[in-house]
Swiss-Prot record:
Pfam families: PRKCSH. Residues 111-237 form the MRH domain. This is Protein OS-9 homolog. It comes from the Eukaryota. Residues 474-492 have a biased composition (Polar residues). Residues 441-466 have a biased composition (Basic and acidic residues). Glycans are attached at residue 68. It is found in: Endoplasmic reticulum membrane. Belongs to the OS-9 family. Residues 1-17 form the signal peptide.
Length: 558
């Protein structure tokens, strides 16, 4: 059989599955656009409104709405959309064939583990084994260790295991997006429900990444979980790719008794036709920034900002639509859009796109050795300098979040890695103390060797003199020289056997944290303007580590 190696995760059951990402606005999809130009009450009453959308050509129906006491009229496209085109339907597989094809594509992941952090908990998902929840060691993220270490007193909860007779696999779709779902049972017993914990693991095609990654984990009800994994593997088969993401505009105008008169009906839609081009341009540019470890629910770019997750979108619809009188100020403050003159504002009711709530998590690892600073971000080998340059170019770092720390302003990377500074200094202090202790031990050992050598020499000389007196020959010099050479060789061998801890320490990597403040990279005790300065400062510290005064200068004294 094709998938014998997946015996533990194979099943013919095709039960219905739950998807927390279901979207009430998925079909049809709309964006709400507020035009800057108001309409005259007389034009609205006389029906001087276009009957078709000037960009898409769809018939329009109109509804009067009121926001904060201001009347608005909105043109709603009268269309019906299908979830899949005819060509897509022709290429669809049967449920069993789709499941087997999806399992085949995911086969290379078998035995690999993915990790995810949420709050105080960490999750480990090993394909073919199961999902485990535990509390990570330490109360903060720093220094970052991957995979997240487990606290000594943390219990381990198995949320679900791949068991041959207790695992079901299905391929289904929600919101037009097909995915492979594993229903894992046999988890740790839950005292609140009296049953074992269960989890549904959903694999969805994610074309924007190169590696498998956990998108989110939710507890949909007590001890019953859903986890979604984004993977490029399913994208190899177009039948598992999501349908094209298209939305139709709902254009709204404020209605006023006195408003400028348009020369033509089409004049009301000036500035609308170019919106699509702007969206595509910004989307293409933003895709250069998104990396494999971006922690995101379905993120896409539209016009000038990021979309909200779908669940959060619903909460914000009322906020924006309820404050349309001051919408220009509101949009600018929230960073949603800064439209040019006569261009429409855009609010998307399907997946909101303001940047603030999107968490962009990167695994940042800084290593300072005695001679070299190493820096990397586990994001397709893109360095922090390159990302920082990109954020600077955008002119807005106010809501960037790295490893749980929020950028506070545009001045620079503030508090990115500040929390690890204390740990670094403790480590350096510890190393300094160890170096001092080692030096004292070496000195004591050397003193003992010298004393032993003197005792041996004295004994040899005494015996040589006695021997010379007995036989009447002068053998003092040769005998003394022989024993002295032997004694020195033994001491030298003992010295070589003693490990030089100071030299070993110079080659060890120190996992450290830096932060950027007032235009300078800093570590506690250092204020340097660039990486070369950091390397120089660390090298100076290494060169002077045996000098108590120098340790005191760097804040490393006992």
């Amino acid at each position: 059989m094709l998938l014998k190696s997946l015996a533990l995760i194979a099943s013919s059951s095709l039960a219905a599955t739950f998807n927390i990402g279901d979207d009430l606005f998925a079909d049809p999809q709309f964006t709400v656009q507020f035009h800057n130009r108001p309409l005259r009450q007389a034009d609205v009453q006389n029906g001087l409104l276009p009957h078709r959308d000037p960009v898409y050509g769809h018939p329009l129906g109109y509804e009067m709405m009121q926001f904060n006491g201001t009347n608005h009229i909105c043109g709603i496209p009268e269309v019906t959309t299908t979830k899949s085109s005819k060509s897509r339907e022709e290429g669809e597989l049967s449920p069993t064939e789709a499941r087997d094809r999806a399992l085949e594509l995911m086969l290379p992941l078998l035995g690999d583990c993915l990790f995810y952090e949420q709050g105080f908990f960490s999750y480990r998902f090993c394909y073919g084994s199961g999902v485990v929840q535990y509390r990570r060691h330490g109360d903060n993220y720093f220094p970052r260790i991957y995979p997240p270490p487990q606290a000594d007193d943390s219990p381990t909860f198995v949320l679900g295991s791949f068991e041959k007779d207790d695992t079901t696999n299905t391929v289904t779709s929600a919101g037009g997006i097909p995915f492979l779902a594993h229903r894992l049972r046999s988890g740790t017993h839950c005292p609140l429900t009296g049953a074992n914990r269960e989890i549904e693991v959903q694999f969805v095609c994610d074309k924007n990444v190169q590696h498998d990654h956990i998108l989110w984990i939710k507890e949909k009800r007590t001890c019953n979980y859903v986890m979604q994994v984004g993977t490029p593997r399913l994208c190899k088969d177009m039948r598992f790719q999501p349908p094209p993401d298209e939305s139709l505009p709902i254009m709204c105008y404020s209605v006023e008794s006195e408003a400028p008169e348009f020369e033509t009906i089409d004049g009301m839609f000036d500035g609308v036709a170019h919106v699509k081009e702007e969206q595509e341009a910004v989307s293409a540019r933003a895709h250069q920034f998104v990396g494999s470890n971006v922690n995101k629910d379905k993120i896409d770019e539209i016009e000038v900002a990021w979309r909200f997750t779908k669940a959060r979108a619903l909460n914000y619809i009322g906020v924006w639509l309820g404050d349309c009188v001051n919408r220009q100020t509101l949009f600018k403050e929230l960073g949603i859009a800064t439209p040019s003159h006569d261009a429409p504002f855009i609010i998307q009711t399907r997946s909101m796109f303001v940047p603030a709530p999107i968490n962009r998590h990167f695994e940042v690892r800084l290593m300072i050795t005695r001679q070299q600073l190493l820096l990397s971000i586990n994001d397709d080998d893109v360095t922090l300098e390159e990302k920082y340059a990109w954020w600077q170019e955008q002119g807005d770092m106010s809501n960037l979040e790295i490893q749980g720390l929020t950028m506070l302003d545009d001045a620079g990377i503030e508090d990115v890695l500040a929390r690890a500074t204390d740990e670094v200094m403790k480590q350096l202090n510890k190393e300094a103390k160890q170096s001092k202790k080692l030096a004292k031990k070496k000195e004591a050992a050397s003193t003992k060797r010298e004393e032993a050598k003197k005792q041996v020499e004295a004994s040899v000389e005494e015996k040589a003199v006695d021997s010379a007196e007995d036989d009447g020959t002068d053998t003092v010099t040769s005998t003394q020289t022989f024993f002295r050479t032997q004694t020195l060789s033994t001491a030298e061998a003992e010295s070589k056997q003693m490990p030089d801890k100071a030299e070993e320490d110079e080659d060890e990597d120190l996992i450290v944290t830096m932060y950027f403040e007032d235009g300078e990279f800093k570590i506690e005790g250092f204020e340097v303007a660039d990486f070369e300065g950091v390397k120089s400062a660390m090298k100076d510290l290494a060169d002077k580590e045996d000098d108590d005064d120098d340790y005191e200068d760097y804040g490393l004294s006992d």
